[in-house]
A protein has these predicted regions:
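Conserved alpha/beta core of the MobA/IspD/sugar-nucleotide pyrophosphorylase nucleotidyltransferase superfamily
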Residues: 2-7, 160, 166-225
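Short glycine- and hydrophobic/aromatic-rich loop-to-beta-strand nucleating segment
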Residues: 150-154, 194-196
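Nucleotide phosphate-binding site architecture
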Residues: 19, 29, 159-160, 203
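Nucleotide and nucleotide-moiety/phosphate-recognizing core
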Residues: 2-148, 180-187, 212
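A short local structural element in Rossmann-fold oxidoreductases
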Residues: 23, 64, 163-164, 206
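Short beta-strand and adjoining strand-loop segment in the mid-core
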Residues: 89-91, 157-162
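Residues at alpha-helix boundaries and the short loops/turns that link adjacent helices
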Residues: 31-34, 165, 169
Length: 225
């Protein structure tokens, strides 16, 4: 019998970035009738997260409005200029002792599905690993490749490191420190790793393609993160 611990996992959707590469606010872009922020919240909700928060900037207010429409708790990042780690800190600071882990799903991964999130949450609860990470596995001319994906699940044991003001390199640095002890879930579905942060990538997913599926990676194995 497999014993699964009920680790309280809170989904966190960072939506406070400047969207410079896209040229417009990614959170409010639509795909199949739902905004990117709605798709992220839906995936986390269907995937078994206990609660969900969306972190938005002070302006533009259109992002806040879209986030409020999802039914998730909406938090404000007063200064997102230092990158995604600032949104992560806002979320962790708000959650206090109410979360055992966070499932970090950036708003520009709109193809992630609830069943994908559930696989990751189940793995995190089963292993109690400090990190639970998804990778997309694929093959080009018989050579195996990996591409990083989301959501990444960070346990409470790592919160102090993520909150450390001296941290350089953001959450990526924390991932590298603890990668050997991470639980890795391998997916064959490219949607787990489809980052839609440029106009061409948005056009690709609207046409039903993943933005990178026809482009060989620069290295034979691209490892998380």
């Amino acid at each position: 019998m497999v014993i699964t611990n009920h680790l309280k996992i809170v989904g966190v959707v960072p939506a406070s970035g400047a969207s410079q590469r896209m040229g417009r606010d990614k959170a409010v872009l639509e795909l199949e009738g739902r905004t990117f922020v709605q798709r992220a919240v839906d995936a986390l909700r269907c995937g078994g997260c206990d609660n969900i928060v969306v972190v938005v900037p002070k302006v533009p207010t259109i992002i806040r409005a879209a986030a409020l429409n999802t039914g998730a708790r909406v938090l404000t990042n007063p200064d997102p200029s230092e990158g995604p780690i600032t949104s992560m800190r806002v979320a962790i600071g708000h959650l206090g002792d109410s979360a055992d882990a966070i499932a970090w799903l950036p708003v520009d991964f709109p193809l992630v599905r609830g069943e994908m999130v559930r696989r990751l949450c189940d793995l995190a609860r089963r292993t109690l690993a400090p990190l639970t990470l998804p990778v997309h596995e694929y093959f080009i001319e018989g050579v195996r490749h990996e591409k990083r994906g989301h959501p990444a699940i960070f346990s409470r044991a790592l919160f102090s490191e993520l909150l450390d003001p001296a941290l350089q390199g953001g959450a990526r640095t924390v991932v590298h420190r603890h990668l050997e002890n991470a639980a890795i879930e391998v997916f064959r579905d490219p949607r787990i790793a489809t980052d839609v942060d440029t106009p061409s990538a948005y056009e690709a997913v609207q046409a039903g393609r993943t933005p990178y599926e026809d482009q060989p990676p620069q290295t034979k194995v691209e490892r998380y993160p």
